């Protein structure tokens, strides 16, 4: 196709000006300055560029995204002019690294954020210029601290910049290590997790940082300035060792690997020791109970007063009641003790047998203190959402989810459990589908923080739910007759109102008395247990084995007595025979102070 001469020069001039405005100071090719002429008739632009480089005995790498068709005649005095012309016509960007010519589409130009720790942006720029990689046509923007550089350009240019930055960082680090010695220490963890833990639930996720991440944040956020005795600043070359600090987690060993100056290693040891502490094991059981509203009196519930428990305590579920009435009647708010919980569950079981109550769900979850745990039982159905031109499936999820973070609060000998609770309970309402067939989802969300004493349970109640059930009855055959069959059909609707209760039962899982007895005489019980045929209280072999293991020195036996006393249990000691000496066996039971080696349980209310 022929173009008018003035139109052709106008297009070339416009493209050249645009190229110079966007990419000034272009690096020239070091190829032979000989003319290049090419006549294309619907040929591939890729083939044209390959033929162009072959004409100068050069190597070219053409992007796969360049698939245009070319028609026309190209005549240029040198390769630089041809390359700029073809780039302006077909939106190309090129980069020459001294050996290979790389050609990409403008859409492939990307950006990178390079983080420098050992060197600065000015040093990186100087290294790029000396190596011949620097290209002023592309973006280069450092931050005020000269530690972050925002670079843009074609992919090959970005790769060379990143490789140069990595080599410069390593070289600078080696130079710094010569001026200041570094040490590497491995700190194994016993209880805490070295690496991060990710908790997934529904469409969300929560990251629980490990010890390595916590230390990295402390190092990255802290600004350390060292001064001498005469209040003079230390030169930066002497403080470079603090910038080389590196903390990594080794999941296979559950250990922390630290690289830093030797004088700072005790600080890491103290921090890691403070973070690596044993956590209490806490079990939380959640009971979701539906009770017929008409049968609340059978349960002993009065929303104006509370629940009558087995030890004559009142449990006020609706905590917005009269506080003076609560105080005068000894009410415990939404907390009940173990005896009151047994009474409540017994009444629920009775009503369940009569069809007036239902235990909807009862999940149990075991976790550690200050560690978030999630139990999620849900269902997902998908709804087709149609737009103007596209349609997609959108998932709707509902079910029972318990998310909690427990914490143990200790005051003297008393322990409480602080629960950060999130309960979500959802279900599909029956007979609630609309015209489009999408059912209605009912959700109940409870988000609270509660403190529960040892042996107590938390009740959250007063949530009413209305259920509508539709039943259709008819006379066989006659009810199916058109029009006339309506006389032989009957449709009945039944509305049932229920009250939903959430019962949360937290408890601390301790190691038990058997653990203390095993530690008392320092003997391992596991080998003997494996030889016992029957594990029961009636097993003679097991009783003989336990009797031998319970015989221990006096100081160890007294430690067990002290532990029993802290748990409100009385005990006394009896003599027994150990391997080479006399020992003492702890007997749990009531005793009088006049008896030998008697430790009575402390009286309630007496500290």
Swiss-Prot record:
Q: Which residues form the signal peptide?
A: 1-26
Q: Where, per UniProt, does this protein localize?
A: Cell outer membrane
Keyword annotations for this protein, in alphabetical order, are: Cell outer membrane, Membrane, Plasmid, Protein transport, Signal, Translocation, Transport, Virulence
Q: Per its record, what triggers expression of this gene product?
A: Thermally induced and down-regulated in the presence of calcium.
**One Pfam family in the UniProt entry:** Secretin_N
Protein's GO biological process: protein secretion; protein secretion by the type III secretion system
Q: Which InterPro entries match?
A: Bact_Secretion_Sys_Channel, NolW-like, NolW-like_sf, T2SS/T3SS_dom, T2SS_GspD_CS, T3S_SPI-1_N0, T3SS_OM_pore_YscC
Q: Which GO terms describe its cellular component?
A: cell outer membrane; type II protein secretion system complex; type III protein secretion system complex
The role this protein plays is: Component of the type III secretion system (T3SS), also called injectisome, which is used to inject bacterial effector proteins into eukaryotic host cells. Forms a ring-shaped multimeric structure with an apparent central pore in the outer membrane.
Subunit structure of this entry? The core secretion machinery of the T3SS is composed of approximately 20 different proteins, including cytoplasmic components, a base, an export apparatus and a needle. This subunit is part of the base, which anchors the injectisome in the bacterial cell envelope. Forms a stable homooligomeric complex. Interacts with the inner membrane ring inner protein YscD/SctD.
Q: Which family does it belong to?
A: Belongs to the bacterial secretin family. T3SS SctC subfamily.
Instruction: Please state what the protein is called.
Output: Type 3 secretion system secretin
- The gene name reads sctC
